[in-house]
């Protein structure tokens, strides 16, 4: 009977945990639906910005923001987008693993999300700056603050290169870590769509210098939004799997409990019958 009591306690514990994971799954699903509406608009916005800047860059020969494909890199700033909360499957670990695979000795981290801060601190990797007030309500204004800081770091030559590592959203069950180089822009890697030359007033060089903040802002805003929707999709999947596993475990424990209970009852009946036979 003591073992039966332990099994009953275990069943109740599994049932309670399943209720929690199911609730977390529903919350993640609600957040996923909310932020998914922003993804299409964000993709369209970022695509338009890329297209515009490709046209501008096609007419710029020399700029602090442009480099040849064989440029030398001594120090890179890695912007790493993680979540603030856990329980989201491999969402954070996949991004951090990709960073570690490419990190060089002098490189530093710009951590977005408290999980990125704690991870790279534990690895004793220098964190240049951090932002943790990131959620599904991330706005273009918040992106501008980050963008302005990054732009200043690059113009002041604190880093030769700035890259961002985020989670690319493909669909509700597929998302993968990806890297985008923000600076320098390598002209040979761009795809120019307009065959006809566009005339800029004032010249393209001046327009690039005056509007480069729009370019970097679009990248920051777009990657954070895409990472946010990937985070919620990953958490929903993780909690759904946890709930299903919990229900399966509960079923197995219930069968085990019922078998042991039946065995205990059978044993008690046998003892009663044996006692009655002995008296007769």
UniProtKB/Swiss-Prot annotation:
Listed InterPro entries: ATP_synth_F1_ATPase_gsu, ATP_synth_F1_gsu, ATP_synth_F1_gsu_CS
Protein name, per record: ATP synthase gamma chain
GO molecular function annotation: ATP binding; proton-transporting ATP synthase activity, rotational mechanism
Organism domain of life: Bacteria
Alphabetical keyword list: ATP synthesis, Cell membrane, CF(1), Hydrogen ion transport, Ion transport, Membrane, Transport
Predominant subcellular localization, coarse grouping: membrane
SUPFAM superfamilies: ATP synthase (F1-ATPase), gamma subunit
Source organism of this protein record: Mycoplasma mycoides subsp. mycoides SC (strain CCUG 32753 / NCTC 10114 / PG1)
